[in-house]
Amino acid sequence: MTSVWSEAIQHKDLKQWIQEVAELVTPKDIRICNGSDSEYVEIYGLMQQSGVAIPLNRDVHPNCFLVRSSPEDVARVEQFTFICTKEQKDAGPTNNWRDPEEMRQELHGLFRGCMRGRTLYVVPFCMGPLNSPFSLIGVEITDSPYVVCSMKIMTRMGEEVLKALGTSGSFHKCLHSVGVPLAPGEKDLAWPCNPQHMRIVHFQDDSSVMSFGSGYGGNALLGKKCVALRLASYIARSQGWLAEHMLIIGVTNPEGQKKYFAASFPSACGKTNLAMLKPKIPGWKVECVGDDIAWIRPGPDGRLYAVNPEFGFFGVAPGTSATTNPNALATCTSNSIFTNVALTPDGDVWWEGLTSQPPEGLIDWQGKPWKPGGAPAAHPNSRFTTPVQQCPVLDPQWNSPEGVPIEAMIFGGRRSETIPLVYEALSWQHGVTIGASMSSATTAASVGEQGKLRHDPFAMLPFCGYNMAHYFDHWLSFASNTSLKLPKIYGVNWFRKDKNGNFIWPGFSDNLRVLEWIFRRTNGEESIAKKTPIGYLPEESALNLEGLNLSTQALQDLLSVDVPGWLKEVANVREYCKIFGSDLPQAITDELFRIENELKIIK
């Protein structure tokens, strides 16, 4: 089996690893992926022949296809996601911990013979611009052609990565299988998966990933959450940088001044919408560097610089429309993969929110005729996978090896009460406390109950690869480096509701009005803010509200300090932080006491 494929691999350790894996999983053949367009077309063709991929109408969506997953494999599975470290305390209370050696033994049992009857694909990939100091190279071994096609879109993948790796470069070993071996002559499932034995496992001792049983996005595209966040956050701590669940945008004002912001929101809370925002206010421009992950390093001038390590967008489809995100729709017009959306009779895609009325004759995400009034036609976590270069508002510096300088960091969540529209941290320590205090109503991006409020510090709860309290400490440590020019930190909340349960703020493109205030604050405008215990809030006259029909009461709700609500908030955060015990940094404890004491004074 070795002689045919090994000619493409010059790296001795990589060649040896592929051979070891092949002996364990016993595939029918091995293919080294070169990342070419012709390879993509060929593998997509194989998926089409087997019934996995449904080609879409070429007049509407050229070179696009639809894939339907198993109903048992539709989202991230946090309960089956593990961090393996030598000591349990290094994983911390927010991660599922397992002993690395015990877990390796268990996984070797699961992987033994698991690719029988399937092709083993070797997918070399790079997270971050090639030959950038930011970048990490990985190699994913998988038996899923869907993963190969998705990795072609989501990462820099193939021959150019092998060339950059050379004969001795370091790489992250990422092993994936759907976990369904095939007997000779056995017909394959449309979406093979093994939900009873799902495992997504991160080994921090050798910076590797093993994923078994799921073919869904974040569980199977191992460059994304697994390498770019769970492994990278662990590496970043030891090397003095940050790997964050953040979008990156460039914002230009009417005078031509440009600033870059990074913003952190839990999954399905509007990151992609903000990253591709189409301003209503004349003269302003927002350009997208990335919509999901940011790697942030101190630059030679003391500023923090960020890159988007990804090469594509993996966006939530429901709710995306010409009104909410026209740029996202334009991005995924061609060369894209749609997963678990509905299909129209003329070969187009549809999902809830795309149009006000569903077209007739829809086939739902499970391949069944759909009738209005029942279950959604598209799964709530249905996705589009699309190349970043197709984004009409892509920032010119999106692929810069040095990254872009960040002047503001923004933290937000889905909160119906208490949290104001926007507020600025009083200090870096306070800003870290804002990030650590984040909570949000849960969404369909992960398996579990939706709409329940859960704490999600820095929107990293599912993605931090080590003890979250140590992660807070790492953030705080940046303030002790006096050579750094740290960005200002902000909290935002687009999701406040009135007493009737209606959203107060229009959101979407109108969020630029908040970005405009942040922009002015980073320019040092003092008079547009008032100091409060929770941070600097906008003066009501400082927000550009032209064209909005906001009542005085609505504006007051958005921009005032709800003292009883905030006292409850502080108590709630303090109670949550008990899970970290003595590992919780004293600075966060002190900041919570400061906020509480100052609130009691104005009460």
Swiss-Prot record:
Q: Which GO terms describe its molecular function?
A: GTP binding; manganese ion binding; phosphoenolpyruvate carboxykinase (GTP) activity
Q: Which cofactor does it need?
A: Mn(2+)
Q: Which residues bind GTP?
A: 268-273, 383, 414, 508-511
Q: Do the record's keywords include Nucleotide-binding? A: yes
The entry marks the following residues as binding substrate, namely: 76, 216-218, 267, 381-383
Q: How is the cofactor bound?
A: Binds 1 Mn(2+) ion per subunit.
UniProtKB keywords? Cytoplasm, Decarboxylase, Gluconeogenesis, GTP-binding, Lyase, Manganese, Metal-binding, Nucleotide-binding
**Reactions this protein catalyses:** oxaloacetate + GTP = phosphoenolpyruvate + GDP + CO2
- InterPro entries given for it? PEP_carboxykin_GTP_CS, PEP_carboxykinase_C, PEP_carboxykinase_GTP, PEP_carboxykinase_GTP_C, PEP_carboxykinase_GTP_N, PEP_carboxykinase_N
Residues annotated as binding Mn(2+) are 225, 245, 292
Sum up the protein's function in the record's words. Answer: Catalyzes the conversion of oxaloacetate (OAA) to phosphoenolpyruvate (PEP), the rate-limiting step in the metabolic pathway that produces glucose from lactate and other precursors derived from the citric acid cycle.
Know the name of this protein? Phosphoenolpyruvate carboxykinase [GTP]
Name the species this protein comes from.
Chlamydia abortus (strain DSM 27085 / S26/3) (Chlamydophila abortus)
